[in-house]
């Protein structure tokens, strides 16, 4: 039986929608998300180098393996619920290097792990202790270094904080999506004290939330809004029609423009970028629909732009490693 690998939103470049100002005339891809594109089948191993790393397992290194960061030499994991406080450090061969647990109520401890950012050059781990609106910084042996207190109005509980450069973290604040607040979602925060270094502003006319709520329950797509890609960053603002790349030199440029405008659709259909390769741009459309009784919805379509053929397709990706399992 063939097994299909679905490429869901992981990597790419951003959207500006219902915004004032003229769209750029070149150097970006235009995607009509209402079009019926021809089908295309791809083999994962034809465009990506696939590596499987078995993690060392023993009495100390037993983990449900929620991936937090991958560096040149290290892999950082926590357990999926993030509440037991365990942090696991493996090398790139899968050999366990260290288990850290600084869970507790003390000033140098965390009560929860929302996510972990790794600065491999400085040997620092940034623990998102989001219930206390702070990042706690440890070295790779688990020794406390400092606490970074951030603004309590930020909502980083989605766990999207990453190492941006030597001095800053890049973070995604999703509180505006929940409350329809007109505010920036992307920020650079200082690694030294957690202060705001830069607000990354993306233009849009009014806030459009990808979330739906009913009776105190909320549901939203699980696509990613902030991803690193070849030294630049993908910033996905659901209220916009243009997908941008944000570079280390703080320059920002359009990469993909979606049509029709997001503000013209009911229900809205969002475009989330995914993996970028030298030849292919993977994307996913997500429709804002959810059945709260059946707990199903947000129907998706996987797309790929083939640069060699200069054409967009609806795609299915097969993983040869799984086909004969």
Which residues does each PLM region occupy?
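C-terminal motif of bacterial Sec signal peptides marking the signal peptidase cleavage site
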Residues: 15-17
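Blade/loop signatures of beta-propeller domains
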Residues: 23-52
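Beta-strand-rich domains and repeat architectures in extracellular enzymes and scaffolds
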Residues: 51-85
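Blade-loop segments of beta-propeller domains
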Residues: 58-60, 95-121
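Short coil/turn segments at the loop-to-beta-strand junctions that recur within blades
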Residues: 59, 101-109, 150-157, 203-207, ...
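Structural signature of eukaryotic scaffold interfaces centered on beta-propeller domains
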Residues: 66-69, 116-120, 160-165, 214-230, ...
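Asp-box/WD-like beta-propeller blade repeats and closely related beta-sheet repeat scaffolds
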Residues: 131-136, 140-183, 199-207
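Conserved small/polar residues in nucleotide/adenosyl-binding loops
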Residues: 323-325
């Amino acid at each position: 039986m063939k097994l299909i690998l679905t490429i869901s939103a992981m990597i790419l470049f951003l959207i500006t929608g219902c915004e004032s100002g003229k769209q750029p005339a070149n150097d970006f891809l235009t995607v009509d998300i209402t079009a019926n594109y021809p089908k295309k089948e791809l083999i994962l191993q034809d465009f990506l180098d696939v590596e499987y790393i078995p993690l060392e397992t023993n009495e100390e290194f037993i983990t449900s393996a929620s991936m937090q960061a991958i560096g040149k030499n290290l892999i950082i994991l926590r357990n999926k619920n993030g509440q037991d406080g365990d942090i696991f450090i493996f090398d790139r061969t899968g050999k366990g290097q260290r288990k850290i647990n600084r869970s507790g109520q003390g000033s140098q401890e965390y009560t929860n792990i929302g996510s972990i950012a790794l600065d491999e050059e400085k040997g620092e781990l940034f623990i998102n202790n989001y219930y206390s609106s702070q990042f706690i910084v440890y070295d790779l042996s688990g020794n406390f270094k400092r606490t970074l207190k951030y603004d309590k109005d930020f909502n980083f509980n989605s766990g999207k904080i990453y190492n941006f450069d030597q001095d800053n973290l890049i973070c995604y604040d999703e509180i505006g999506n929940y409350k329809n607040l007109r505010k920036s979602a992307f920020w650079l925060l200082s690694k030294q004290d957690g202060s705001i270094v830069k607000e990354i502003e993306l233009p849009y006319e009014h806030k459009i939330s990808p979330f739906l709520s009913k009776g105190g329950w909320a549901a939203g797509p699980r696509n990613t809004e902030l991803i690193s890609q070849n030294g630049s960053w993908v910033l996905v603002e659901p209220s916009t029609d243009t997908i941008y790349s944000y570079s280390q030199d703080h320059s920002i440029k359009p990469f993909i423009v979606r049509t029709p405008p997001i503000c013209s659709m009911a229900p809205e259909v969002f475009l989330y970028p995914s993996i970028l390769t030298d030849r292919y741009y993977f994307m996913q459309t997500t429709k804002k629909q959810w059945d709260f009784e059946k707990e199903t919805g947000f129907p998706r379509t996987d797309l790929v732009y083939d640069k060699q053929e200069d054409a967009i397709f609806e795609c299915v990706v097969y993983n040869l490693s799984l086909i004969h399992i």
